[in-house]
């Protein structure tokens, strides 16, 4: 899969004209089929029922208009409180990094701030723990802060990962930007763009060098392969290049990768960043486990009721 690099960011390549035409035609066919199903359902109804359904559809239209206003007001409210959160996040960052001392601290302390704060906060989350490998941990100990913000042009949101100077890569900040499009008043992921990491020689965590022994008279054969790493988060799934054909299996795999990538982003944005200390102390883990257990208990009670009804 080829990628273009510009201004330190990996740019996704566009679909070929042929692939675009195929996708557009497929989408048109699906929409046409849905429209025909809609008409078929209405025409199959008795006249009196059809009139009632027409009224229900008008009610739905009124609901949809209110829903649009809801999303607009929700976005404005989120923007308002994001600004109010800012000073709190800034103070948190200063305490974690040791820039701001806490009242009552003794002078006899071995280390500043809260070591491995973000590493442990992320590792305590089930989704992110699957992405963090043992080889990543030393590099993530240099993670100083994580921030996110909404962007308007294009619409979406952006992450910034701030790092101390470290032996793994040159970048002080790694970014990941998600471009969204509105579809039926719901934001849908269009593409994601990540920073190209400038690895120091011999420290790249997203590749591994494999060595194969050859005959005694020749040197060992070495080759480089991609490997699993948290830092692959900054190289998001991309559309295949112009030379590739998007078959059904490839499209499904790409869709799964993009959904997984967005799950990670949502977890960082909605859980880790706003509640970092709760994840660090594992309090958030207990809350999630309790919530899951409560749901399971509810389902078991429902099943018991069903069996009781059947026996009765």
From Swiss-Prot:
Keyword Metal-binding: no
GO BP, sorted A to Z: double-strand break repair via homologous recombination; nucleosome assembly
Main location, first listed in the record: nucleus
Keyword Chaperone included in the entry's annotation: yes
Record's subcellular location: Nucleus; Cytoplasm
Motif Nuclear export signal in this chain: 45-60
Matching SUPFAM superfamilies: NAP-like (SSF143113)
Entries under Gene3D superfamilies matching the protein: 1.20.5.1500, Nucleosome assembly protein (3.30.1120.90)
GO cellular component term of the entry, any: cytoplasm
Source superkingdom: Eukaryota
A Pfam family matched in the record: NAP
Keywords, ordered alphabetically: Chaperone, Coiled coil, Cytoplasm, Nucleus
Cited InterPro entries: NAP-like_sf, NAP_family
Coiled coil (UniProt feature): 24-78
Molecular functions (GO terms): histone binding
Span list, region Disordered: 288-312
Recorded family membership: Belongs to the nucleosome assembly protein (NAP) family.
Domain text: The acidic domain is probably involved in the interaction with histones.
UniProt function note: May modulate chromatin structure by regulation of nucleosome assembly/disassembly.
Identification of the protein by name: Nucleosome assembly protein 1-like 4
């Amino acid at each position: 899969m080829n990628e273009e690099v510009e201004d330190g960011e990996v740019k996704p390549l566009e679909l070929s004209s042929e692939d675009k035409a195929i996708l557009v035609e497929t989408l048109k066919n699906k929409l046409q089929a849905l429209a025909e199903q809609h008409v078929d359902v209405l025409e199959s109804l008795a006249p009196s029922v059809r009139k009632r359904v027409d009224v229900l559809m008008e009610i739905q239209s009124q609901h949809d208009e209110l829903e649009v206003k809801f999303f607009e007001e929700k976005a404005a409210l989120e923007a308002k409180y994001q600004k109010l959160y800012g000073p709190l996040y800034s103070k948190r960052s200063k305490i974690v990094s040791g820039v701001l001392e806490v009242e009552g601290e003794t002078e006899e302390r071995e280390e500043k701030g809260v070591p491995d704060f973000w590493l442990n906060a992320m590792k305590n989350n089930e989704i992110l723990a699957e992405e963090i490998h043992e080889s990543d941990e030393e590099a993530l100990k240099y993670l100083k802060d994580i921030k996110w913000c909404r962007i308007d042009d294009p619409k979406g949101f952006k992450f910034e990962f701030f790092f101390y100077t470290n032996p793994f890569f040159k970048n002080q900040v790694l970014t990941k930007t998600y471009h969204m499009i509105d579809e039926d008043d719901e934001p849908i992921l269009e593409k994601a763009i990540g920073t190209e990491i400038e690895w120091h020689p011999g420290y790249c965590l997203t590749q591994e060098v494999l060595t194969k022994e050859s005959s005694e008279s020749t040197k060992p054969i070495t080759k480089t392969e991609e490997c699993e790493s948290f830092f692959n988060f900054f190289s998001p799934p991309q559309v295949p290049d112009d030379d590739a054909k998007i078959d059904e299996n490839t499209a499904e795999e790409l869709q799964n990768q993009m959904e997984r990538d967005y799950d990670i982003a949502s977890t960082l944005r909605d859980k880790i960043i706003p509640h970092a200390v709760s994840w660090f102390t594992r309090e958030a883990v207990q809350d999630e486990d309790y919530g899951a257990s409560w749901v399971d208990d509810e389902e078991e009670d429902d099943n018991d009721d069903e069996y009781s009804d059947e026996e009765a």
